Curated annotation (Swiss-Prot):
Gene: comB
InterPro entries from the UniProt entry: ComB-like, ComB-like_sf
Family: Belongs to the ComB family.
Keyword presence, Iron: no
PANTHER family (UniProt xref): 2-PHOSPHOSULFOLACTATE PHOSPHATASE-RELATED (PTHR37311:SF1)
E.C. no: 3.1.3.71
Record-linked Pfam families: 2-ph_phosp
Keyword Magnesium tagged: yes
Origin species: Thermus thermophilus (strain ATCC BAA-163 / DSM 7039 / HB27)
Gene3D superfamilies per record: ComB-like
Protein name from the UniProt record: Probable 2-phosphosulfolactate phosphatase
Entry-linked NCBIfam families: PRK14100.1
Amino acid sequence: MRLRVDVIPGEHLAYPDVVLVVDVIRATTTAAAFLEAGAEALYWTPSLESALAFKDEDVVLAGETGGLKPPRFDLGNSPREALSAQVAGRVVVMSTTNGTKAAHAAARTAKHVLLASLYNAHAAARLARELATEEVAILCAGKEGRAGLDDLYTAGVLAEYLGFLGEVEPEDGARVALAVKRAYPDPLEALSLSAAALALKQVGLEADVPFCAQVAKSTAVPVLRGRVGEALIFKRA
């Protein structure tokens, strides 16, 4: 099975099989946390405006712009906040700067799209392995069009675990991700050095970083199940 890692989304990229979308700080971590808290479904939209179109008393709007909760949204993009949110049985509509856009890029061609993070790394890798017939691709969201150490490190963790599950043929991007993972024995160190973590520190949200650095704490894997309007519908596997 081919194992591929793309460090940022690209218009030219196509995916024939399974894609693990990674935005570890913070969207894909927060997505798993919302499912842990009992959310029925996650609607991932490509923009804040398209998220607001779903605003309703039965819907929870969550997202960020510049790391902070946007106006008229109920919640930000904090996984700590998501885990304790009153979302059981409800739809959570999410829009973020990088993660939701990466998911839409993957969904253009992939057979299966999963949201992965360190938080659900082992469960996400196992499911990807079960679903794949020829390739598992890991798509890093990056930060505003640039590669992110945090996502690349997470891709390395996923790639390593996929290798434990069975034989893989890593392409160059996967080898780079594996090398990054091996360079940082401590997940928190790798994440803390990233531009995404430094941006959170600037807005006083650095407490989210240790949460995002937890490895394999959740079995909740958001899987793409459909669409409504511009939104991708993710549900727990």
